[in-house]
Amino acid sequence: MKKIALVIAAMMVSLASHAQFEAGKAYVGASLSGLDLSYSGLTEGKLSVQGKVGYLLVDNIMATAQLSYEKQKDVPYVLSVGAGGRYYIVQNGLYLGASALFKHHKGYNDLLPSVQVGYSFFVSRTVTIEPELYYEQSFKNHSDYSQFGLRIGIGIYLFKDPTQN
C-alpha cells in the first residue's frame, strides 16, 4: 500500500511541475552575483545585480530579456542589456540558457555571448530560488572581461495566457 501511495504522489508531483513551464506563462526574476562568487581578470571587489523578464513561448522554452548593473573596485559602473532563451531540460526545474549581452562603461563597449545552467527550486506554486552557473565570453579582451561565476536569484512565474489552451 505504501508503494502505491508513493507512486501516486510521484506522479502528482511530476504533473504539477510540468504545469510550471507551460506555454503562455510570464517570468520576472532578479539575481545577485559577485561577493567572490565570480571570476575574471578584473573582478576584485565586484558586485552585480540583474533583472530578467521572460515569456514561455512553448512548453519548456522561454525567451528572456535582462538588464544588469555591476560595481567593480576600480570601475565606477558597468551596465549591460541582453536577450536570450532558456530550455528546461527536465520537468523538475533544471535548465540551460544562452544569451547575448551588450556591456558598457565609460570608454568600453563589448558584445558577449553567455551560457548558463541552473535549477529552479519552487518554494511555492509560482516563486523559485534559482542558483545558476554562468560563463560570459568577451571577444574584445578575453583575459580581463570574460568571466564565469555563480548567481543566486529569485523568480516569479506569473500568469498563463487565457488565449492559449
Which residues make up each language-model segment?
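Residues that define the transmembrane beta-barrel architecture of outer-membrane proteins
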Residues: 24-26, 43-49, 77-81, 109-113, ...
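Extracytoplasmic loops and strand-loop junctions of Gram-negative outer membrane beta-barrel proteins
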Residues: 32-36, 100-101, 134-137
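Cleavable N-terminal export/targeting peptides
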Residues: 1-25, 159-165
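Surface-exposed strand-loop-strand hairpins of Gram-negative outer-membrane beta-barrel proteins
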Residues: 35-52, 66
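Outer-membrane beta-barrel "beta-signal"
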Residues: 27-31, 121, 145-165
